[in-house]
A protein has these predicted regions:
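Metal-cofactor-dependent catalytic cores
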Residues: 1-267
């Protein structure tokens, strides 16, 4: 149950069309066949060992810039300041995987295969819906680290849906005390089930544009999270406090429905 007396609304929608690369801000997004947002994490990079090439494994990926057409029909890849003069190139999205594979292979100096999935490549295959965080939660993170902007916090945590008009960690209300006790809620016309607090990976401590590690990030964040647990948070779900945002599940009945910036969040 969403219990706090607030008026939550969808403030931002961010797609990450290529897993681990830059996001694109959109005003509306459709629920895709896998329960995530259409075009979110639709491309993933694979090395010859069949593993993802992503920010968790390869810090150099942070050096790549991706800029998308307004309708996400094309992506322009570049590496500003690269001494090897990797060319800036534009690829049709999501169809031009072969040419993009060659570009990434040249950059990483190893064989890279770009794969496309209309269902996306989520980290959590069970709670594969959009991740939800509040603007206030991201601002709370910024306040811990002098000089960090809210846009930088967005890039570090890479969530898809951002809610305004609520206090920090309000999104903790969107999962229950038990793993199987999903919390049902709606954003606009789309029905969701809140699943669990999202455990964070090695990516948030890294500068999203250089990959440089901010030492102490995880401890500072976790200590703050532990000492600032709201009374609505199901704390039993925190085996550790390096968690931010809520993972969701979206039923196949919601496929094709649209989310719009400004949509209300309802219990």
């Amino acid at each position: 149950m969403i219990s706090s007396p607030v008026s939550p609304r969808l403030a931002n929608i961010r797609l990450h069309p290529i897993k681990s690369l830059d996001p694109v801000h959109v005003k509306e997004a459709r629920i895709g066949p896998g329960g995530g947002l259409a075009f979110d994490r639709a491309w993933a990079l694979y090395s010859v060992d069949g593993e993802w090439v992503n920010g968790k494994r390869t810090a150099a990926i942070h050096l790549i810039r991706a800029a998308y057409a307004p309708d996400v029909s094309a992506v322009t890849l570049s590496v500003p300041g690269d001494s090897r003069n990797i060319p800036t190139k534009t690829f049709a999205f999501p169809g031009d995987t072969a040419a993009a594979s060659q570009w990434f292979s040249d950059f990483f100096e190893q064989s890279i295969t770009v794969r496309h999935s209309s269902e996306g490549f989520p980290d959590d295959n069970i709670a594969s819906g959009p991740t939800i965080v509040s603007t206030a939660s991201l601002q709370a993170v910024c306040d811990l680290f002098p000089g960090m902007t809210i846009d930088e916090a967005r890039q570090r945590f890479r969530t898809t849906l951002e809610i305004e008009g609520v206090p920090a960690f309000w999104e903790d209300q969107l999962f229950g005390e038990e793993e199987r006790s999903a919390v049902r809620f709606r954003i606009g016309e789309v029905n969701f089930e809140g699943s669990n607090p999202c455990a964070r990976c090695p990516v948030p401590p890294r500068d999203p544009r250089t990959g440089e590690i901010m030492h102490g990030f995880q401890k500072i964040f976790s200590d703050y999270r532990r000492s600032h647990v709201p009374n609505w948070t199901p704390e039993s779900r925190f085996d550790h406090y390096y968690r931010l945002a809520t993972n969701t599940r979206v039923a196949s009945t919601e496929t094709g429905k649209l989310l719009h910036v400004g949509d209300s969040v309802l219990s």
